[in-house]
Amino acid sequence: MSDTQDNAPVSAQGVDQKAAAGCPVAHDSVTAHGSESESPAIDSPSAVGGGRPRTNRDWWPNQLDLSVLSTNSAKVNPLGEDFSYAKEFAKLDVEALKRDITEVLTTSQDWWPADFGHYGGLMIRLSWHAAGTYRIHDGRGGAGDGGQRFAPLNSWPDNVNLDKARRLLWPVKQKYGQKISWADLLVLAGNVALESMGFKTFGFGFGREDVWEPEEIFWGPEDTWLGDERYVSEKEFSAGVGATEMGLIYVNPEGPRGNADPASAAHFIRETFRRMAMNDEETVALIAGGHTFGKTHGAGVADDHVGPEPEGAPLEAQGLGWMSSHASGVGADTISSGLEVTWTDRPTQWSNRFFEILFGYEWELTTSPGGAKQWVAKDAEAIIPDAYDSTKKHKPTMLTTDLSLRVDPAYERISRRFLENPDEFALAFAKAWYKLLHRDMGPVSRFLGPWVPQTQLWQDPVPAVDHELVGAADIAALKAKVLESGLTTTQLVSTAWASAASFRHTDKRGGANGARIRLEPQRSWEVNQPEQLATVLPALEEIQREFNAAGGAKISLADLIVLAGSAAVEKAARDAGVEVTVPFRPGRTDATQEQTDVDSFRVLEPRADAFRNYLRPGEKTQPEVLLVDRAYLLNLTAPEMTVLIGGLRALEANAGGSRHGVLTDRPGVLTNDFFTNLLASGARWKASESTEHAYEIRDVATDKVKWTASAVDLIFGSNSQLRALAEVYASEDAREKFVQDFVAAWTKVMELDRFDLA
C-alpha cells in the first residue's frame, strides 16, 4: 500500500484525514495523504524483505477507529490505580524544588553549555512550547499532561533541542520522583527561570498529572515537516489546527511560508494566538516578554549538519536528537531554528529593552549564518553581548514576527503603550504567561500548591458553596416535587444532559456546575433546544425557590437540574420494571452571567452531539466519527458510549424532537429496545431519499417503514466492535445490566466537572 492512498484512514488522530481532517478524529476541509505511520512525517516501517504486516487499517482504511477511547488506560500506568498525585505532591518542599531548579539554570554543563551562563531562555522556551499547543476549538494540546515527552511533539521542528532542556531537568525529576510530575516540572522550569532573572510572576498552580502515552491529536494533514497543506487560501488555514505549518507551535518566525513580510505575519500571529485563547494585548505581551530573554541558534546550515530528531535517532542516541556536526555542535556552534537572534543587551535580566530596541532602530532584511531570513538594525552599534565570548558584541537583530509588533497598527499601539509604561507591560506579561501555562487545567479547584492566585475570568469561576447541602430526606422530597411538576421524562433528561455534556476533559471546561445552561451563550444553542429550556428552567427555578424559602438546607439550580434528570431516569427504569437509585452528590453552585465570558464559551458549542442525535447543518464530517470525538471529550469508554446511546434513545432525548433512533414502542421507558430492534432479523436498512444522514428500517415482508435512524444509530449494528457491545445489551438477560450500566455512565457524565469529589 502506498502512503498516498485514495481511501484515507478514519484514524484515532483524525477522521477521513483526506476529506475532513480534525478531532482526535477530524475537522473541516483540509486534505491529507493518509500517512500510515503514527507521525505524519515519519515513513511507515518496513518488514524484512520489503513488505510489512498488513493491519486492519490497511485492509479497511475507512473503518471507524475506537482506539482513542481506550488510550492511557490503567494498563499503561506504572504507578497503579491507587496512586494519588495530590497526596504525593503534599509531601513536596516546593521551595527546595525551586532552589534546585535555579541551581540547574545557573550551572552550565559542558555537554550542552548555557547561553550567557544561564539556561533561563531555554527553559522559558521549553515551558512555552509545552503549553503553547493548546487550542480553544477542542481543548486539545497544552501542558496539562506532559505530552511534550512523546512523539510527535518531542520531535517537532519547533521543539528542536528542547530534548536537551528536559535532560538538564532530569536530575531534579529523579531526586523528587513522583512528588513532582513531568507535566508540572516542564512548565515550572520556565516560571522559575523568569523569577531567577528578576521577573515577578503572577503565580503558579501545580496539579498536572503525567500520561504514559501520547494523546492522539490531529495536528494537521501534512506528511512532511513544515508542510502547509492546511491553507485553504492565502490568508486562511483550516479551523481544525492551531499553527500555520506542520511541526510549529504558532507561526514561521521567518514570515508566512518563509516570506519575510511583518505585516502579513501579523495576520497569522493574530489568528494562531486567537486559537490559543489570547487577545491582542496578551499576544504582544507574550512575544515581547518571552523575547526579552535568551537567543535563537543558527550557527550553520541545518540541512548540512543536523541529524535526525529524537524519534528518528539511533538507539545509542538514547532519546536525544538533532545532533550537529557543525564544529563542536554545541554552545556557539549550536543550530536550532537556523535563526541567529539575540533580542536585547540584557538577555538574562528582565527589562523593557525589547521594546526600546524594537522602536529604537530601523531594520533591514538579512540572513543568519544558517541562511534564515532575519532583520538587523541599520546604522547601529554592536551592543548585544555574545553568548559565549565576553569580548564580542553584535548588532541588534529581530525576527520578522517581532517586527509585526511594530508594523501592525493594533499591535503597534499596544507595543508603544508598553514601551512607555514598563510596569503595565510587566503585569500584562505576568498575567498572559500565567494564562498560557494554565489554560488547559480547568478551574482553580484543581490547582495544588501555595502560589495559586485569585481566580481569573478565563477560568470559568463558580461561587463557593455558602449554604447547608441537602440530605437524603430533602433529595427524596425534591425528586417527588420534580416528578409532580408536569415536566416529562424526556424534558428532564435532555435538560440535565445538555447541562452536563458541555464538559471537555481535554481542558476541563464545561459541565453542569455553574448551571450555565441558563446563561448565554449556552441557553441559545440550537442543540440545547432553547424553546424547551424556556419551559423547563422556570419550572425548576420555582421548585428551587419554594424549597429554599423553607429554611435550612438549600439547593442550587445546578444541583436541581442534575437531580431532576436523575429522578426522571429512576422513573423510566421503574416503568421498565427495574428499581434503581441514581447516585446524587450535591455541591454544585450557580454562576452568574458576569462570571461567564460569552466569547470564551462559544467554542464549547458542539458541532455534533450524537447522544442527542444532533448534527450541525452543513457538517461534512461523518456523524459516527463525531460520535467518537464527543465520547472522547466526555472521557467515556466504548461500552459507556454504547449504553448511553441506547438509553438516551429510549428516553427520547434527541434534540429538536427527532425520532431517529427511537427504536421502541415505549418511548420514555428505560428499556434496551434500541439494541434489540437494531439487531433484529427480518428488516432491511435503506438510506433515506429525502433526508440527509437518515436511514429507514423496513419490514422485509411488507416493505413498510418501521423506524428511522441516523448513521450514528446504524454504526452500532455495522461496526463489528460496536455490534459486539450492542449484542451484550440486546440479550434477554441484559435488562437489569443495561439499566445499571446506563445509570453508572449517566452519573459519570453528571459528575465530570465535580473536581471537589476527587
Swiss-Prot record:
Sorted alphabetically, which InterPro entries does this protein's record hold?
Catalase_peroxidase (IPR000763), Haem_peroxidase (IPR002016), Haem_peroxidase_sf (IPR010255), Peroxidases_AS (IPR019794), Peroxidases_heam-ligand_BS (IPR019793)
The Gene Ontology biological process terms listed for this entry are: cellular response to hydrogen peroxide; hydrogen peroxide catabolic process
Reported modifications of this chain:
Formation of the three residue Trp-Tyr-Met cross-link is important for the catalase, but not the peroxidase activity of the enzyme.
- What keywords were assigned to this record? Heme, Hydrogen peroxide, Iron, Metal-binding, Oxidoreductase, Peroxidase
What does the entry list as the binding residues for heme b? H291
Q: Which domain of life is it from?
A: Bacteria
> Known EC number(s)?
1.11.1.21
Positions bearing the Tryptophyl-tyrosyl-methioninium (Tyr-Met) (with W-128) cross-link: Y250-M276
How many cofactors are bound and how?
A: Binds 1 heme b (iron(II)-protoporphyrin IX) group per dimer.
Bias-annotated ranges (Polar residues): 1-10
Question: What GO molecular function terms would the record report?
Answer: catalase activity; heme binding; metal ion binding
Cofactor or coenzyme needed: heme b
**Catalytic center at which residues?**
H129 (proton acceptor)
Q: Which NCBIfam families match?
A: cat_per_HPI, PRK15061.1
Q: Main role?
A: Bifunctional enzyme with both catalase and broad-spectrum peroxidase activity.
- The protein here is known as Catalase-peroxidase
Please name the source species: Salinispora tropica (strain ATCC BAA-916 / DSM 44818 / JCM 13857 / NBRC 105044 / CNB-440)
